[in-house]
Amino acid sequence: FSVMSYNVRLFNKYSWIDSSSIPASIEDLIRVKNPDVLCLQEYSRSEAPRLDAYDYKYIQPSREMGKSPLAIYSKFPILDQGYIDFEASTNSGAFIDISFRNKRLRVYNLHLESFRINAEDSLFSNPNSEALQLKFDEVFRKQLTQIDQFNAVEAVNDFPSIVCTDLNNTQFSKAYKALSVDRNDAFTLAGKG
């Protein structure tokens, strides 16, 4: 059983990277890795490649109303699904329940708050470095609030779960520590973390 998580950045819809081959490259990687469940953050319906290996999918929000869409593709039938609308944010979470080896399993796809750092943001050369630090502090608070919202959903879940996330933070952060309580980090366990 394999799971893949990937922030596809709208499949380069707005040409942030000067290459028209980005969607095809993403599609090729997905086909080569061939995960059983695929969680995508910053999804774009209009730019997404056809992923014929997956008979089941859940995309949220259903209408792109100021939220960054998430998609979960599955080779297993989806028994249940849900959406976690992070308050005062363009980010959110979603989940699906599937049956694997005759057991119900939940897969979460979370996209936590981004720092939205740009070229002008520098603690060293920016005269407004104090404002930048306040921006960081606000993002840290939002991420922890989003994890609290996720934990409230997970608290009433009776099934084993897998959490895929674009954490928008490091493994040394409070967000990582809060999200990893009583969980195993597959990246670390694989010996690459």
Where are these regions (language model features)?
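Active-site metal-binding loops of divalent metal-dependent hydrolases
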Residues: V8, Y43, L112, D166-L167
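N-terminal signal-anchor transmembrane helix
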Residues: F1-A24, D28
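Active-site charged/polar residues at nucleotide-handling catalytic sites that mediate phosphoryl
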Residues: K33
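Metal-dependent phosphoesterases centered on the DNase I-like endonuclease/exonuclease/phosphatase
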Residues: S122-G193
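Generic enzyme active-site microenvironment
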Residues: S5, C39, C164
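Catalytic domains that recognize anionic headgroups
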Residues: Y6, F11-K13, V37, K67, ...
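Structured beta-strand-rich core segments of catalytic domains in phosphoester-bond hydrolases
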Residues: F1, A24-D28, D36-I117
